[in-house]
Amino acid sequence: MKVIVSENAQQLGKKAAELTAQYLREAIAEKGSARIILSTGASQFTTLEALVKEDVDWSKVEMFHLDEYVNLPQDHPASFVRYLKERFVEKTGGLKAVHFVDTSIGTDAIIEKLTGELKEAVVDVGLIGIGENAHVAFNDPPADFENQASYIVVQLDADCRKQQLGEGWFPTIDDVPRQAVSMTVSQILK
């Protein structure tokens, strides 16, 4: 593992974007396409802003979405689908494929759909942060590292919900959803 220390968020985001673009270009050169998993949250702002400016043939990149609240409309300011559309998808000029966690079709249906799509090929790179309470995606501590499913429905704990409130995504704690569909730890580690 290589640790990179940066002076600020802009510098860190730019470096993360450069490395990610390099991995994507290498995968495209080797296999003809690349697959990326994207997460959301304030920690990704500078990285995604810099990544869409990188020299990558986005038409050969398939994007997977890490997690999404259950029953939150996609036009809600806190929707991760909206976040990724506005900050990434719409700025790439067109991706090979986009696999959103669209909970509007039902949790069982989206989990089955995404699981099938994930199994088609290896994911080349993931941009995944760690939350204030040490959650990865919506796998709050103590997460189940043994669950071999690709995606699951999770109950959001109080600390996770407080983080979402604190970041300004929701006006009150009661507005923060209590469930989400999340990629599992075992899938993230693949």
Where are these predicted regions, by residue range?
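Glycine-rich N-terminal segment of FAD-binding domains in flavoprotein oxidoreductases
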Residues: 25-54
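Ligand-binding beta-strand-loop-alpha-helix segment within the catalytic cores
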Residues: 58-127, 175, 188
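Glycine-rich phosphate-binding loop
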Residues: 121-146
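N-terminal glycine-/serine-/threonine-rich phosphate-binding loop
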Residues: 1-36, 108
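Short, intrinsically disordered, charge-balanced linker/junction segments flanking boundaries
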Residues: 40, 188-190
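Short, glycine/charged-enriched secondary-structure capping and boundary segments
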Residues: 51-54, 77-80, 113-114, 136, ...
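Class I SAM-dependent methyltransferase SAM-binding "motif I" and its flanking Rossmann-like core
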Residues: 137-185
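Generic structural signal for well-ordered alpha-helical scaffold segments
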Residues: 17-25, 52, 85-89, 115-119, ...
